[in-house]
Amino acid sequence: MGKTLMALITAALLSTSSLVMAASVADDMETIAEHYGKVLKADSTAVIKQDLQAMRVAAVDAQKGIPTKLKSKVEDSPEMKDFRHGMDVLIGEIDGALALADQGKLDEAKQAAQDFKDTRNTYHKKYR
């Protein structure tokens, strides 16, 4: 019986810790914004790639979440589909900038990152 109780306690702690570790959409957006500023100021391809990769990880995580404004919507609602599409667009833009950085094209990667603002502005109007 002691082993069963320990197993249940361990399972409960693990499930709780994974919930605590999961970032909210708002947290992910803060991470994206923080690294976006660094991308625009990057002075090397190594730095820009590191920050673009951090943005990508946060964008993928945010895409799995539900923004506060959409909490009352069902998973397959038009609004949720549009939110996920917006995240797909951003992830694609990040991938494009990463590809340029991988080719050593720092200035072009920074220019491509400027386009992220249009995507942000479009989707923030709807879901922020």
Curated annotation (Swiss-Prot):
Signal peptide: 1-22
Gene Ontology CC: periplasmic space
Cofactor(s) annotated in UniProt: heme b
Pfam families noted in UniProt: Cytochrom_B562
Cofactor binding annotation: Binds 1 heme b (iron(II)-protoporphyrin IX) group per molecule.
GO molecular function, one term: electron transfer activity
Example GO biological process: electron transport chain
Localization annotation: Periplasm
Annotated positions binding heme b: M29, H124
Keywords carried by this UniProt record: Electron transport, Heme, Iron, Metal-binding, Periplasm, Signal, Transport
InterPro entries: Cyt_b562, Cyt_c/b562
Entry function: Electron-transport protein of unknown function.
Assigned protein family: Belongs to the cytochrome b562 family.
Protein name as catalogued: Probable soluble cytochrome b562 2
Name of the gene this protein is made from: cybC2
